[in-house]
């Protein structure tokens, strides 16, 4: 069961539960008469409140407003990957071709396959790279460590309004995404109180049907949906497998 995986459970505690706390705070403020001119303005305000809640104080989460496209997410991921595998790379940075090998490995056919990879070998998720320089052979790079979640050398970043789509797929901007070591693992869809949380759930389903969760977003493990007053979460699944009863 994906939801019982230690990694996912910790994300639930650090992401979804903090999201609920932030959204409850925002709800309390709105109950005292705060209004916005449009639904989209309200939703952006909710996003800002959530990001502030996740990153305030001594939180491990870092807000990265510069990461606003899939290309930038990949660049950030490879930066983390090289930082975490200095000894294995032995002063030979990844080439363009080698990065494409890794991108192909991380373009999962569904979220369940991503979950199996994240479970890893002895709790470590790795990618294999055939070095372009044949004399360097084949190496395995560590991406995620289950025993390092919530500490250690893992990095925790928050991004929002990342542009997805292109090449025949409608372009959209996601609400809030949580990254671990550069990989998107939790997608949060937010609606204002004039909508139900099911509107956010349907938006997630629509994005999947449109093909928004491909490439680097195919590693997602949890969806969080909220309309400020109600927040629910569910293990990531393809649109035809998402069941609202499990929210």
Model-derived segments and their meaning:
Residues 2-247:
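An alpha-helical interface "stripe"
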């Amino acid at each position: 069961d994906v939801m019982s995986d230690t990694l996912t459970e910790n994300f639930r505690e650090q992401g979804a539960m903090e999201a609920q706390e932030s959204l409850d705070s925002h709800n309390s403020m709105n109950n005292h008469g705060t209004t916005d001119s449009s639904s989209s303005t309200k939703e952006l305000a909710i996003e800002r409140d959530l990001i502030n809640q996740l990153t305030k104080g001594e939180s491990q989460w870092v807000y990265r407003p510069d990461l606003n496209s899939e290309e930038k997410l990949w660049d950030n991921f490879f930066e983390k990957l090289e930082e975490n595998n200095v000894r294995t790379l032995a002063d030979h940075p990844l080439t363009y071709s080698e990065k494409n090998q890794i991108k192909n490995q991380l373009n999962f056919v569904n979220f369940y396959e991503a979950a199996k990879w994240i479970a890893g070998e002895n709790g470590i998720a790795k990618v294999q790279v055939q070095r372009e320089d044949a004399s360097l052979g084949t190496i395995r790079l560590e991406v995620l460590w289950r025993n390092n979640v919530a500490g250690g050398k893992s990095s925790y970043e928050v991004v929002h309004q990342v542009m997805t789509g292109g090449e025949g797929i409608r372009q959209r901007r996601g609400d809030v995404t949580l990254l671990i070591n550069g990989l998107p693992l939790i997608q949060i869809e937010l609606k204002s109180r004039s909508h139900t949380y099911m509107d956010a759930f349907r938006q997630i389903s629509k994005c999947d049907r449109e093909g928004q969760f491909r490439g680097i977003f195919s590693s997602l493990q949890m969806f969080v949906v909220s309309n400020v007053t109600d927040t629910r979460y569910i293990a990531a699944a393809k649109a035809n497998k998402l069941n609202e009863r499990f929210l």
